[in-house]
Amino acid sequence: MQGSVTEFLKPHLVNIEQVSSTHAKVTLEPLERGFGHTLGNALRRILLSSMPGCAVTEVEIDGVLHEYSSKEGVQEDILEVLLNLKGLAVKVSGKDDIILTLNKSGIGPVTAADITHDGDVEIVNPHHVICHLTDKDASISMRIRVQRGRGYVPASARVHSQDEDRPIGRLLVDARFSPVDRIAYNVESARVEQRTDLDKLIIEMETNGTIDPEEAIRRAATILAEQLDAFVDLRDVRQPEVKEEKPEFDPILLRPVDDLELTVRSHNCLKAETIHYICDLVQRTEVELLKTPNLGKKSLTEIKDVLASRGLSLGMRLENWPPASIAED
């Protein structure tokens, strides 16, 4: 194997050993020394925390108002039933939010196979036990909400945002969206021709059956690559600053004098002088206003007090008045 000492070996998929339908070993080699742990740890974290999937998020059980209760004829208490529902492995095509229904009566176990669903839904573990009915007259009916997400979202993280609209009897469930149940990696020595200082990465994972192990590795690698894209080009790329255009005048000056809520006498006097906007008013002096017919010192004092309450006064000098927007009107 000839090449520059600065060149890095690129790993390739060597083997996928399917131990069972939900358990597989994936081997990647060769890797430069140290890259086995670097990539193995990164992929492990992504596979555990960031893989998308579907999970039960809410449940409504007929006759049950809260999770700290029991139901007649059901062997398990409601908390245990909710815990069992978390173990459902569901694949959903084309939808992010669905409602499944379950109706069962008579003595015996209630399993995932008893759930009613349409063709867009596949329950991977139909033999998964949800609860047991202990009486021939016992029955259970529930509506199960399944949503798409990623990682782990506890019910406590959603209870405050949904509490106002959530009816009594709708029980929130801790949602574990990740289809990967367990993952571990091991790094062994590898050899390529004369080089013996290389790594072999062995990733062993168990899933809930809703995702193929090879596809899981591919998705995790894609997520990692997308996150690292920002470091590929470290040029200082700055977002263009959006300069906020400051209004030419204080917005209050563009409001009509009607907003000052003056007395009828004062308002009519200003209207007679064609003073329509507050800006027209503040540019007048006390002497000019006192020349207005029927506007005495009492009205002048009222106008000054109202303007002062808004941080304005008479005799202000404003340039470029009136603005084009008003002049055009």
Swiss-Prot record:
The keyword Iron-sulfur does not apply. Homodimer. The RNAP catalytic core consists of 2 alpha, 1 beta, 1 beta' and 1 omega subunit. When a sigma factor is associated with the core the holoenzyme is formed, which can initiate transcription. DNA-dependent RNA polymerase catalyzes the transcription of DNA into RNA using the four ribonucleoside triphosphates as substrates. HAMAP family: RNApol_bact_RpoA. GO terms for cellular component: cytoplasm; DNA-directed RNA polymerase complex. This is DNA-directed RNA polymerase subunit alpha. One of its GO terms (molecular function) is DNA-directed RNA polymerase activity. The N-terminal domain is essential for RNAP assembly and basal transcription, whereas the C-terminal domain is involved in interaction with transcriptional regulators and with upstream promoter elements. Transmembrane segments: none annotated. It comes from the Bacteria. One of its GO terms (biological process) is DNA-templated transcription. NCBIfam families: PRK05182.1-2 (NF003513), PRK05182.2-5 (NF003519), rpoA (TIGR02027). Belongs to the RNA polymerase alpha chain family. Keywords: DNA-directed RNA polymerase, Nucleotidyltransferase, Transcription, Transferase. It is an enzyme of class 2 (transferase). Residues 1-235 are annotated as: Alpha N-terminal domain (alpha-NTD).
